[in-house]
Amino acid sequence: MSSSAIQVAKTATYLPDLVEVQRASFKWFLDQGLIEELESFSPITDYTGKLELHFIGSEYRLKRPRHDVEEAKRRDATFASQMYVTCRLVNKETGEIKEQEVFIGELPLMTERGTFIINGAERVIVNQIVRSPGVYFKDEMDKNGRRTYNASVIPNRGAWLKFETDKNDLLHVRVDKTRKINAHVLMRAMGLSDNDVLDKLRHPEFYKKSIDAANDEGISSEDQALLELYKKLRPGEPPSVSGGQQLLQTRFFDPKRYDLGRVGRYKINKKLRLTIPDTVRTLTHEDVLSTLDYLINLELDVGGASLDDIDHLGNRRVRSVGELLQNQVRVGLNRLERIIKERMTVGETDSLTPAQLVNPKPLVAAIKEFFGSSQLSQFMDQTNPLAELTHKRRISALGPGGLTRERAGFAVRDIHPSHYGRLCPIETPEGPNAGLINSLATHARVNEYGFIETPFWKVEYGVVLKDGDPIYLSADREDEVRVAPGDVATEDDGRISADLIPVRYRQDFEKVPPEQVDYVALSPVQVISVATSLIPFLEHDDANRALMGSNMQRQAVPLLRPERALVGTGLETQVARDSGMVPISRVNGTVTYVDANAIVVQDEDGNDHTHFLQKYQRSNQDTCLNQRPIVRCGDPVIVGQVMADGSACEGGEIALGQNVLIAYMPWEGYNYEDALLVSERLVTDDLYTSVHIEKYEIEARQTKLGPEEITREIPNVAEESLGNLDEMGIIRVGAFVESGDILVGKVTPKGESDQPPEEKLLRAIFGEKARDVRDNSLRVPGTERGRVVDVRIYTREQGDELPPGANMVVRVYVAQRRKIQVGDKMAGRHGNKGIISRILPREDMPYLPDGTPVDIVLNPLGVPSRMNVGQVFELLMGWAASNLDCRVRIVPFDEMHGAEKSQQTVETFLKEAAKQPGKGWVYDPEDPGKLQLRDGRTGLPFDQPVAVGYSHFLKLVHLVDDKIHARSTGPYSLVTQQPLGGKAQQGGQRLGEMEVWALEAYGAAYTLQELLTVKSDDMQGRNEALNAIVKGKPIPRPGTPESFKVLMRELQSLGLDIAVYTDEGKEVDLMQDVNPRRSTPSRPTYESLGVADYDED
């Protein structure tokens, strides 16, 4: 394939940095967030007020991390830096000041790629979308069907305040969902007189009823109001005026307990049209009065008051890494503050130093807990570069302070008009998380307040102004202007061509002349996410299938020789580059040295810059990370140029699969129900071969009976099994291992009780001690095989941190090449997925008029009902591109260039391809897009012409090798004594109630009985059955299943007298072994050997 790419649809597709969400947020945390937190806790005074400890936050510093990123991964360490902050201890009595730099904990640092290395594993902190603090006005229907209104003031942290109206036009207030209190009681408690309130309201007459109601209750003074407030908020405690005062003060006016946050203040000011400075983060009297006023206007339906939509993106904000981390640091500092106060009280005042007061543990614990076990700190999805990039751009509504799956209704999950250009309407998981986990749209960015913005070009007098930077609008701003979509057709000078343009205005569509348009979207791609924007002809696919296509691209396994898509969208380069998988030149200069491990670039000043490449590293998902240089010695490079391909990249573009020749036709039923029929060429030419690296680990522990040993001396193992082990008993790198082979030899000391009777016999006869260790080696599991690519040994002597009780840890990495096989899952980019049902020799595959056999035969019935016609466009465009020997870039939504543009483009290309010499058969005007195929087995033509072409097909990570599993005997569950489930537990297959019905319907009573007893949980019966099979005797009758006994015990525990009786009415105790047929005694005895004095313990 020549690599000339033709851009079919020209639009502005320059994208912002795609990982900026993560990096910018962490940078904010280092520059501001951390300092803010440290300074908000300072000063800390002791209970007597004699000592003060100040944190000088702006003077914090970070030390160089102990390990670099690679080293941290290798040693299972955390890539973190030590934080030091200057503390000042002031003694108020003596005026003495002690200043000292104090260690306050370790802070994990973000790598260049926007990830964190925690205990050697790469993790991503997912962005969370939560309800923004501020004031919200809602309406509710009461029992009589009358509409009432309420207003909630939601802070960043602290108590909620909710005002509501009732059917008698009275105003009430609730604090944190407690009982209702008359609103005027709260006003009086806050020290406001009747006139103070009435002067602020535009419709005071409505409020007077509430004043009268308060007076009727006998609450006419501030003191009485405070008493009433205390009674309602703290029922059961003796009320006092001072208590009420303190309660009110701490709940709403103390910055430590109540914080609106910068965002909350901004939103309240905006909604209520206030001008309170954004440094005032607590409630003010003005906030409360304006909220009341707005609520009354709503009730009376005057003054332009409007309700809020809580699913609008103007009312939801994104909390990224920096803010989540800041909240966690606050938790740690809260704990630290308590400790410092205690130490101040206990210690000797004169000799105290800041270092003695500050204990780094609580802060370290809080940060560790966040990175290690928070719902938002996730193990990075590293299947391929796209998966990695998407994971960093993911936005979740779950997590602490967010929603839960069970509680989230339909409205929260639904697509909202304000998502346009901010959240992708397509990419979201299928299943219980649908709509709760979203992906950021391609051009979206998060502003300083955490609201998502998207860019537009300004339009003046019908002309789109594309000079300068685009203008970013948040969802609130966008509602107030008229916005045209990105695929509006324009003349060369930027003038909008059409007479009437569809625009969005206040979440509705209307048609206006070009002069009234305020903004135009930047690009048609800006609505969708990165993964979705890689799907060509997206506009011809049904949304459900596009969703599957987006999700399945993230599951594509990096192949041995990746190939760029013939038909792409032009965003492939940027995805590869921003994912961090491809090394990029840091300077302008010339390549002076290249090999598989490093690239050296000499800059203009003659300095060398070495870029080391990753070779065959294991990713989080066991796929292989490998980089291959694409520059040569002497090549000039510029800053930002891609110098090597990562996994699933080719030529600096993302390449998730292969372009294969596909025909849509049924073939002997082998592609029934989405199955795929594939050619042997995919196997022999290694088209879909991938490398997987599996990690096996064993530790030698200290046991009660002595240490375990890693050794070559393993009891009862033949010498040939040890052939590949070195003198320590560890497999050598490069050895090929099959299942059951020893990777690391290990012996464990065993006590007396572990010894089998024959050993005891030998010791009784000869009095000698057999070597009392047992083989506990690490072996290759059942279905695995491969080549050992790396062995790592960790010991305490080398300074490695080991788990408690371990003396040595050995890790073995085994790589395997997996060719494609029956049972593997494959998919296209349009949600067309299937399982391989048969691999056919290429001479039997249907072949083209020029003799080329096709690679994959798909079922044509997979297209019409699923409505993902994009695959057919891609197929034919790929066919044309392959015959023209070029690659095509098609930006989605091309109708701006004319109606039915996709069809015209494809047809033009096909006609162009047919003009090539000797290629006339490529396009048949009678049957456009179809060719006459012949059957490879008979050579006869098929009845109908068939759609044939090149499509980009992926091999997904659901490989049959990892799924296939069989069990003969294995572990059982402790309670029910039934076999466990799943491959990892060596489990059995579940025989559910429907399977039981099927056997009952056949009347297969004996088969059914043994499935439910000896093959499952009749403990005694299964042991006897095994014994009988081994000895070749008839299998005895089954007994009682263990789960039946468990059921009886459960009913008995409820106090029901339930038991099993014989015909004669005699009770049978199922818990006893009542089996006279037990021919084998429980243990062998050695009386017959004449060792009568042998002590059988």
From Swiss-Prot:
PROSITE patterns named in the record: RNA_POL_BETA
Alphabetical keyword list: DNA-directed RNA polymerase, Nucleotidyltransferase, Transcription, Transferase
Listed Pfam families: RNA_pol_Rpb2_1 (PF04563), RNA_pol_Rpb2_2 (PF04561), RNA_pol_Rpb2_3 (PF04565), RNA_pol_Rpb2_45 (PF10385), RNA_pol_Rpb2_6 (PF00562), RNA_pol_Rpb2_7 (PF04560)
InterPro entries: DNA-dir_RNA_pol_bsu_ext_1_sf, DNA-dir_RNA_pol_bsu_external_1, DNA-dir_RNA_pol_su2, DNA-dir_RNAP_su2_dom, DNA-dir_RNAP_su2_hyb_sf, RNA_pol_bsu_bac, RNA_pol_bsu_CS, RNA_pol_bsu_protrusion
Keyword Nucleotidyltransferase tagged: yes
GO biological process: DNA-templated transcription
GO MF annotation list: DNA binding; DNA-directed RNA polymerase activity; ribonucleoside binding
Entry's EC annotation: 2.7.7.6
Protein's UniProt keywords contain Repressor: no
GO annotations of cellular component type: DNA-directed RNA polymerase complex
Region of interest: Disordered: 1072-1097
Catalytic activity annotation: RNA(n) + a ribonucleoside 5'-triphosphate = RNA(n+1) + diphosphate
Subunit structure: In cyanobacteria the RNAP catalytic core is composed of 2 alpha, 1 beta, 1 beta', 1 gamma and 1 omega subunit. When a sigma factor is associated with the core the holoenzyme is formed, which can initiate transcription.
Family: Belongs to the RNA polymerase beta chain family.
Protein role: DNA-dependent RNA polymerase catalyzes the transcription of DNA into RNA using the four ribonucleoside triphosphates as substrates.
Full protein name: DNA-directed RNA polymerase subunit beta
Organism listed in the record: Synechococcus sp. (strain CC9605)
